C-alpha cells in the first residue's frame, strides 16, 4: 500500500438532475426527478423528501407533491460526463472510469507538476465547476474503497482527504451502508446481529460474517473494514461481464411481468456478447422487492452461452428459485441479468445428439445452434435497419417501457 494518499474518487453530484438544472436554470433549488413512471435520478432537493432513484413515480409524488419530473437529455449527459473525465485526464494518465459520472485517478506520478493530492483534487473541482457548471465531490485516500467512501462523505459538492494514520478512526465510525457491496439486504442482515457501523463489522469474528453472508462476501467485507484493499487502478479495463437491468416501479411477481422483462434484458445482454464474440459461463440474476431489498442468484454452466432465448430461460429458472425462497414477496421493483466468466471464442463446440433433457439449452446441440443462428440473423437485420427493425414478439407486446432506451444504453455503455 502507498505511504501517501494519492488515489482520488471523483463523483459528479446527483449527475442527471444537476445537468437538468444546468440546462434549465429555473429548476435550480427545486425538487426534480428525471423519469416518469420510475424515478431514474433525483436532485438533492427531492432527496430531502425521501425521493430516490428506482422509486415508482407515484410514490415519489406522494412523498414530494411539488416534485417536477423532466424527461431526460441523454446526449447532454454523455457530453458532460465525458468532459468531466477529460479534466481528470489533464492531470494524470492513470484514470479508471467506472460509470458515466464517476472515476478513480491516481495522482502519485504528477505531484511534482501540480502539487499535493489535496491541491490536485481542489483544482479538479474548481475546473469542473467553472468549465461545466457542475458540482463534483472528491475523496482522497490510499485505497480505492476508502477513496470512494470519502467521496460519499464529501457530498454534496465537497472534498475529503483521509491521511495515513487517520484511516481507521475515519472509517470505523461510519455506517456499513457506505461500504462497497453493502446494499439494503446485506445491511438488514448485518443489523440482525447488531452490526450498524464499519467498526462493529471490523470487530466481528470472520467466521460469523462467513456464516451470515457466505465465504466470498464475508471475507471481502472483513478486509475492507480494516482498509485492506490491494486493488490497483485499471486504466484499460476489458469487460469481465455484461449486464442489464430494468426498474419496474411496483409490479406483481407473476409470469406475465417476469417473462417478457427477462427476455428483453437477455436480448440486450446477449446481443452485446455476440457483438464482442465473448460468450459467458456464469449467469446471475438480481431481484429487488417492493421494500428495495434485493436477492441475487447465479449458476455456472458447462459451456459459455450468448443466445438470447437460452439466457432468458436460464435467468427465468433463477428468478423462480428466488421467488420460491421468498414466498411472502408478491411485488418486484427491479430485475437484472448479468453474464460473467466471458471467453474469447466465437465458435461453438458441437454436442452429440444424445437426447438430453436440457438439449435446447446446450449451445452446441442442434437446437442450441439453431437458436444461435436465429440470433445472428436478428443481429444482421438490426445492423442494417436499426435496433427497432426486428425483435421478439413477447417483448414488443408486453415488456414494461418505464425506463427510456436512451437511459439504458447510456448506463450500459462500455466506457
UniProtKB/Swiss-Prot annotation:
The active site is at 102. Mg(2+) binds at residues 11, 101. The keyword Transit peptide does not apply. GO terms for molecular function: damaged DNA binding; DNA-directed DNA polymerase activity; magnesium ion binding. Binds 2 magnesium ions per subunit. PROSITE patterns: UMUC. The keyword Cytoplasm applies. SUPFAM superfamilies: DNA/RNA polymerases, Lesion bypass DNA polymerase (Y-family), little finger domain. The record marks 16 as: Substrate discrimination. Keywords: Cytoplasm, DNA damage, DNA repair, DNA replication, DNA-binding, DNA-directed DNA polymerase, Magnesium, Metal-binding, Mutator protein, Nucleotidyltransferase, Transferase. Transmembrane segments: none annotated. Its main location: cytoplasm. Its EC number is 2.7.7.7. HAMAP family: DNApol_IV. Monomer. PANTHER family: DNA POLYMERASE KAPPA, DNA REPAIR POLYMERASE UMUC / TRANSFERASE FAMILY MEMBER. This is DNA polymerase IV 2. It comes from Mesorhizobium japonicum (strain LMG 29417 / CECT 9101 / MAFF 303099) (Mesorhizobium loti (strain MAFF 303099)). The gene is dinB2.
